[in-house]
Structure formats: structure tokens, C-alpha cells
Amino acid sequence: SFDVQIDQESLRGTLNYTNPNYDFLGNSLNYYVTSATNDKPDQGYENTIMGGGISTSFEQYNDVFATLGFSATRDDLKTTGGASDSLKKQSGTFNELAFNYGFALDKRNRSFMPTDGSILSFNQSLPVYADKAFIANTLSSSSYKTLSENVIGAGKMHLTAINGLGADDVR
């Protein structure tokens, strides 16, 4: 898939390719490349973020899926005199290489437009190399229930925490 978002102050693009049955093994293989540029002269900064990654997903046990991957990101932040003190502290170029893994328990009746069931997932990103080391944890949950013939109820929750390691602050 290819996604582009453009507005007056930013340009974002992502190219994502997924092979849902890599080498006929039942594992999915995903590659992505992304770039984002934000030019905010009123707030005193401009930044460019470029990244890419590769991951694989597979059904480890019945309804339990595992995901493993690596991602790399480069963030170049330039500030001017009008930037906040917080942004000025973050000014510079930062690189990271992270190992990502996750698990999902999928009890939906079908993956596309489910009418019953739930999916619960946990994902974590750990630094292999990072100018500012961090750990990112994400917990997501979605629940689906048929309320009537034409109405499906859905409840969703998404929580993410990013914590700096050692004396490093989170950017």
C-alpha cells in the first residue's frame, strides 16, 4: 500500500508491502519505508523523520499470533529562536535501530469486518542502538458484538507508554 498525507505544514508518505503467505509457509512478511517532513515556522522548528523496517508474523498457537521485526529511524530536528525551550533541547539528529516483538490473542469470528469476538495484543520495541535509548510498550484491545441485524457494536482501547533508559529523556 502507498499512503500520502499533505497539508500546509507537513508531508507524510508511507510505502508498505506485505506478503501474506511468504514462501508458502503461512508466515506474513512485511516491509515498509516512511518519511515525514514538518515545517512549522510559527512554532520555530522543522524536522524530517525517515524510517524503515521489516517484520514477520505467524500463528504460534491456535489463535495466538507472534510478530518479530527490526526498524530503523533517523530524526533531524532544526529549531529557530521562536522554538520552545523543550524543542531547543531536542534539536539535532537522532538515529535508532530497534527490535520489535509482539503477541496477539485473536478470538474474532473473522478478521475482516468482525461481528463477534475480540482481539488483544501487546507489542514492545527495544533499542539495539539509539542516540536516546527507550522502551516502548503498547497494549491494544478490540471487542465486537452483534447488537441487531444491522448494528455491530465495537469497543476499542489503545495504550502506549514510552520510557527513557538511564539518564536519557524520551524525545
Where do the model's predicted regions map?
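Short, structured patches in soluble enzyme cores that scaffold and shape functional sites
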Residues: Q124-L126, L159
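Extracytoplasmic gating/loop element in the C-terminal half of outer-membrane beta-barrel translocons
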Residues: N150-R171
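A generic structural motif
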Residues: T37-D39, L126-A130
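Short helix/loop capping segments that flank catalytic or ligand/cofactor-binding pockets
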Residues: S111-M113, A130, L165
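Hydrophobic, well-ordered secondary-structure elements that form the walls
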Residues: Y17, S141, M157
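Amphipathic hydrophobic-ligand
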Residues: N47-I49, F134-T138
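Short secondary-structure subsegments characteristic of cysteine-rich extracellular domains
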Residues: T138-K145
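Gram-negative/organellar outer-membrane beta-barrel architecture
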Residues: S1-S121, K145, V151
